[in-house]
A protein has these predicted regions:
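OB-fold and OB-like single-stranded nucleic-acid-recognition modules
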Residues: 1-96
Length: 96
């Protein structure tokens, strides 16, 4: 059985401003509601970029892993402010 590794470091595909890539970093709160509950997260990546998570297709809940090191695979879209949006297809929590 040949499985595709979603974390292949060399997997970067350009298509209409979108890149399929792997990102590693610390998952941090990015957005809060009026009751101070976290409603959005981003990844402060080891490449010194910030990736704002727009969606997560993985069954696991990213919010359970805030302040943890994560490795995510997904579609990255560059924003006009220099940050990036990411649609996460798969993620794993890394050992500290």
């Amino acid at each position: 059985m040949n499985q595709t590794n979603p974390f292949r470091e060399d997997k970067i595909v350009k298509s209409k401003g979108m890149h399929q890539r792997t990102v590693s970093g610390i998952l941090i709160p990015e957005k809060w509601d009026d009751k101070n509950n976290v409603i959005g997260v981003s990844i402060q990546a080891f490449d010194e970029n910030e990736y704002i998570v727009k969606s997560c297709l993985d069954d696991k809940d990213l919010f359970d892993f805030i302040k943890k090191k994560v490795k995510v695979a997904g579609k990255v879209f560059e924003r006009s402010d220099g940050k990036f949006n990411i649609e996460v297809n798969h993620f794993d929590v890394m050992d500290n």
